[in-house]
Amino acid sequence: MERSREELDTRLKQQIQFIVEVDKVKNIFRQTYLADANRKENDAEHSWHLALMAVLLKDYMKEEIDLAKVMIMVLIHDLVEIDAGDTYAYDESGAATKREREEKAADRIFGLLPEDQGQEFRKLWEEFEAYKTPEAKYAHLLDNFQPLLLNDASGGKSWEEHGVHRSQVYKRNERIPETSEIIWEQMKEIIQNVEVICTQCPERYVYAASLSRKTDRPQNKLEALLVSVG
């Protein structure tokens, strides 16, 4: 349907308002550190990383994937955190109120767009949350695999800070084999690349050696600690 100039002007204003508003996602910092462990990543960086991974890894999926749909899904999936804030993957108390906070945020943020685009984004966000379609499963795989890779590269820094246990990571990723056995095998290799060094916390993560490093010199506090007790 052809739109009038007035309708186009209104539509563009709404789109610009949304574009400027979602710039705030750059100030929402996650608990995962960048690969160099210098600082934590923000939601914009995380979403960009997932979109790139979506292009690169689709051949490892068990089902055919609508790539364009997945890319939009991962680019918008965390926009609700502008209002709701980031809920750490292993924060049980935060998880209890997460859905309520994010539903309210979705109403406001996607409501800034022209109605048709707002409904499209809201539908994709709900599809991601439902975790049922091949695209939603792929998006979740990416959302789980990316922080695992960054924790591997950074020596498990965020896991060490939060006292995350091996069992928690396995539990969080228990549905990944539904989507890709190959990616799951790689994830298990990362998860299993840990050593127990504390009798007080037998499952606590401490990296023996990062899969991404090829040097005998301790690269970070965790590796240095392991060497000192080994």
Cite the ranges covered by each PLM segment.
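Alpha-helical, largely C-terminal catalytic domains
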Residues: 1-230
